[in-house]
Amino acid sequence: MVAQRARRRKRASATQLYRTCKASGTCPPDVIPKVEGTTLADRILQWGSLGVYLGGLGIGTGSGTGGRTGYVPISTRPGTVVDVSVPARPPVVIEPVGPSDPSIVNLLEDSSIINSGSTIPTFSGTSGFEVTSSATTTPAVLDITPASENVVISSTNFTNPAFTEPSLVEVPQSGEVSGHILISTPTAGTHGYEEIPMDTFASSGTGTEPISSTPVPGVSRIAGPRLYSRANTQVKVSDPAFLSRPSSLLTFDNPVFEPEDETIIFERPYSPSRVPDPDFLDIVRLHRPALTSRRGTVRFSRLGQKFSMRTRSGKGIGARVHYYQDLSPIAPIEDIEMEPLLAPAASDTIYDIFADVDDGDVAFTEGYRSTTQSRGYNTTSPLSSTLSTKYGNVTIPFVSPVDVTLHTGPDIVLPTSAQWPYVPLSPADTTHYVYIDGGDFYLWPVTFHFSRHRRRKRVSYFFADGTLAL
């Protein structure tokens, strides 16, 4: 008979021993370092993690996640995924068809016979209809007396809310019957409303009151483009194509449509060999143009964005460039010399009131003709006269006021009847220079003062609202 050996009992795990022997201090030497993570392998991992990054692999001494798939705690069972199966549909029962059964399935159910109504009467015989004739000659009398019953005409109104004007909506009426209030209304609403008296506000005022409750203080202005900041690089463009076709300075392509007043966006920065103008290298965006005045010039400006560097995330980094071109300088305001509006015509006679009166040629003809005197014009205030007809008005515009001596003379009464030609009478006294309110004015040669010595003398003549004899 062979004796059976006693079964070996399994030793408790390190975690179970650590819970019971830690407090009493009777733990084996390999339990505490294993549970607390102070073994030689753990220390090597701690020292190596200072210089090597092993993130995402689940290797370390900290409380990690166990990598991508996680880990199962000690003395526990891994979780299982419960597979929930979808219930299958019940099979369709297939009816067997025998060889004698019809293979065509009727779409309509069997219906009962519908009664077609009464039968059609049948006629027998060939005699046809019988016509009865009478020899009575009495005329037929018809009773046309109206009936004695009264005819009542009634009308009914139906209200349609969809076609009811707002100005014709009636106020709902209320009536009380046996202590119950009944509301009836022909409108679309289902309840009555309450009339609230309206008050009138601001019945009087000065007209300067604000139209809003909180007026905005000051004037809001739109900020202009900041073209001359330190963050923008200033580049002057001398090519005239910058005004009409700025994309031609960046690429040799000929676009079909190029907006003039909008932002131009390029898909990618072109290589240096494909850029006609090196100032437009790495440009990916040209903003809309702006006209500004800078130091006495009209300037055409566009702000450009460069794409010089790309980060790992794909974002482009570049400087901003201000491209400008001066169109024309703004000239200062010049003083314009004023000229008289009524310039003397070639056929007008110019009279110089400051002419030298001395020995000279004086043309005087017999009869009532005009006397003309030509002298040197050394003054800046000429007088012009325009003679439209024989009895025309004389206009003398003075540039500066001049003191003129006015001499009165005898009055000549004009005739009441107009006769043509009209010959004015000669006044008896001819010692005056100009006759005011007369039929005509005369300039006699004897009135000029002739001196034996050549000297300058001022002679004042005054013509106002008068006529000259031709």
Curated annotation (Swiss-Prot):
Post-translational modification note: Highly phosphorylated.
Short name of one Pfam family: Late_protein_L2
Keywords assigned by UniProt, alphabetized: Capsid protein, Cytoplasmic inwards viral transport, Disulfide bond, DNA-binding, Host endosome, Host Golgi apparatus, Host nucleus, Host-virus interaction, Late protein, Microtubular inwards viral transport, Phosphoprotein, Viral penetration into host nucleus, Virion, Virus entry into host cell
GO BP terms: microtubule-dependent intracellular transport of viral material towards nucleus; symbiont entry into host cell; viral penetration into host nucleus
UniProt-annotated location(s): Virion; Host nucleus; Host early endosome; Host Golgi apparatus
GO terms of molecular function: DNA binding; structural molecule activity
Motif (Nuclear localization signal): 1-12, 449-459
Record's keyword annotation contains Phosphoprotein: yes
Main location (coarse class): virion
Paired cysteines (S-S): C21-C27
Top-level division of the source organism's lineage: Viruses
Entry GO terms, CC: host cell; host cell endosome; host cell Golgi apparatus; host cell nucleus; viral capsid
Family to which this protein belongs: Belongs to the papillomaviridae L2 protein family.
Function: Minor protein of the capsid that localizes along the inner surface of the virion, within the central cavities beneath the L1 pentamers. Plays a role in capsid stabilization through interaction with the major capsid protein L1. Once the virion enters the host cell, L2 escorts the genomic DNA into the nucleus by promoting escape from the endosomal compartments and traffic through the host Golgi network.
Quaternary data: Interacts with major capsid protein L1. Interacts with E2; this interaction inhibits E2 transcriptional activity but not the DNA replication function E2. Interacts with host GADD45GIP1. Interacts with host HSPA8; this interaction is required for L2 nuclear translocation. Interacts with host importins KPNB2 and KPNB3. Forms a complex with importin alpha2-beta1 heterodimers via interaction with the importin alpha2 adapter. Interacts with host DYNLT1; this interaction is essential for virus intracellular transport during entry.
Name this protein carries in UniProt: Minor capsid protein L2
Source organism of the structure: Human papillomavirus type 10
Organism lineage: Viruses, Monodnaviria, Shotokuvirae, Cossaviricota, Papovaviricetes
